[in-house]
Amino acid sequence: MNMRIIEAVDIRYTYPDGTEALRGINFHAERGEVVALLGPNGAGKSTLFLHFNGILQPTSGKIMIDGEELDYSKSGLIKARQKVGIVFQNPDDQLFAPRVDEDVAFGPLNMGLSEDEVEERVRDALQKVGMLGYESKPPHHFSGGEKKRVAIAGIIAMKPDIMVLDEPTSGLDPRGASQILRLLHNLNEEGMTIIISTHDVDLAPLYSDRIYIISDGEIISTGAPSEVFSDIDTIRGANLRLPRIAHLVEILQKEDDLPFEEPYPLTIGEARRKLRNQLR
């Protein structure tokens, strides 16, 4: 079995106005991984994601899904979008129906499923996102976090192998962000491959198996979180920063002469273990 469930191979994309947004991107996610694409605003994160199920077609290069090149015919795009679901940064760009259940049912209905199967999928999806009981309500009156959960439910109902989320916690308060991240963790535990874009350097190491750094349309670093954040010059050169915990340890080492070894801790748990070792 091919472990690379989705792959971008030398993807280049130029917008009609001549803006070169992607410059030879190579990216992959393995089956069951959580992968974060980390970069500042305008780096090309959203543009790359729109290639993953054929919303955009590359100027050159190819997208591979389950070992097969993405086919841009009507039937090929339907097949790709059943395997790869995309959740936009702004849920208002995704929600359009007057009722929650109608919105969540849109994808399954267009897959040609029976009414009973659609109803079951809608109920299951809403239960997973904690929105069961909201079926008849208008989603456009919801909070940002509730809208995001309905948008995710619409993707869950299609049962894709891969869920791609553009800035999933953007604009949410801490509680709303925590609910979304817990939901994504649960979906991943059930076997779904999760790909997120973010510029939140504190979030990425907490939830990701691997990280890609994108800057000016190019991948400039990839690896496990500890590997990526150990290259401090690359992180700062991409107009990003170290996670707060790592930055604190960097200051303690350089300005207070505390003997921390690199790589710096990226989470509170890692920092606690290192501090306990220092105090023994």
UniProtKB/Swiss-Prot annotation:
Signal peptide: none annotated. InterPro entries: AAA+_ATPase, ABC_transporter-like_ATP-bd, ABC_transporter-like_CS, ABC_transpr_CbiO/EcfA_su, Co_trans_ATP-bd, ECF_ABC_transporter_ATP-bd, P-loop_NTPase. Its main location: membrane. It is found in: Cell membrane. Keywords: ATP-binding, Cell membrane, Membrane, Nucleotide-binding, Translocase, Transport. ATP binds at residues 39-46. Residues 6-241 form the ABC transporter domain. It is a peripheral membrane protein. It comes from the Archaea. GO terms for biological process: cobalt ion transport. The keyword Transferase does not apply. One of its GO terms (cellular component) is ATP-binding cassette (ABC) transporter complex. Its EC number is 7.-.-.-. SMART domains: AAA. It is an enzyme of class 7 (translocase). One of its GO terms (molecular function) is ATP hydrolysis activity. Belongs to the ABC transporter superfamily. NCBIfam families: cbiO. Probably part of an ABC transporter complex. Responsible for energy coupling to the transport system. This is Putative ABC transporter ATP-binding protein MTH_133. It comes from Methanothermobacter thermautotrophicus (strain ATCC 29096 / DSM 1053 / JCM 10044 / NBRC 100330 / Delta H).
